[in-house]
Design a protein with these regions (language model features):
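Active-site proximal beta-strand in glycosyltransferases
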Residues: 4, 99-105
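Alpha-helical elements of Rossmann-like donor-binding domains used by nucleotide-donor carbohydrate transfer enzymes
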Residues: 22, 64-72, 91
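Short hydrophobic signal-anchor/transmembrane segments that target glycosyltransferases
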Residues: 24-26, 95-100
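Hydrophobic packing residues within well-ordered alpha-helices of enzyme cores
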Residues: 45, 92-96
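Glycine-rich phosphate-binding loop signature in dinucleotide/nucleotide-binding domains
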Residues: 72-79
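Short, Asp-centered acidic motifs that coordinate Mg2+ and/or phosphate
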Residues: 79-80, 104
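Short His-centered aromatic/hydrophobic patch
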Residues: 83-91
Length: 105
């Protein structure tokens, strides 16, 4: 089954994160994988049985974040990235362009 990566740069369960959790729990054609902005949010997704990773989204260390995302994409054979805010969209676009990945953003 194809995998979809959800990028959530925050570390708390608020509006967009709740919506992402609902989307992930109800996905039928894709297996969700989530990258969160911290352990707290990552643990919530793991409790729901959703594969989840955590990292720090920082403009100072953006290349570290991009390498982390690239490794997750390659490790899990991700085909689609769903970004849930502006920061996530920028990171998704940059990881695709920087590493020339064949993914849909």
């Amino acid at each position: 089954m194809k995998k979809c990566l959800h990028i959530l740069p925050m570390n708390k369960l608020s509006g967009a994160e709740k919506m992402a959790l609902l989307i992930c729990k109800n996905m039928k054609k894709f297996t969700p994988v989530v990258v969160c902005g911290g352990k707290n949010l990552s643990e919530i997704f793991k409790k729901e049985g959703i594969e989840s990773y955590d990292t720090t989204f920082s403009n100072k260390n953006i290349f570290k974040t991009l390498r982390f995302l690239k490794n997750i994409i390659e490790k899990n054979n991700i085909k689609i990235i769903h970004a849930h805010d502006n920061n996530a969209s920028l990171n998704a676009y940059l990881v695709k362009r920087t590493f020339r990945l064949d993914i849909k953003v």
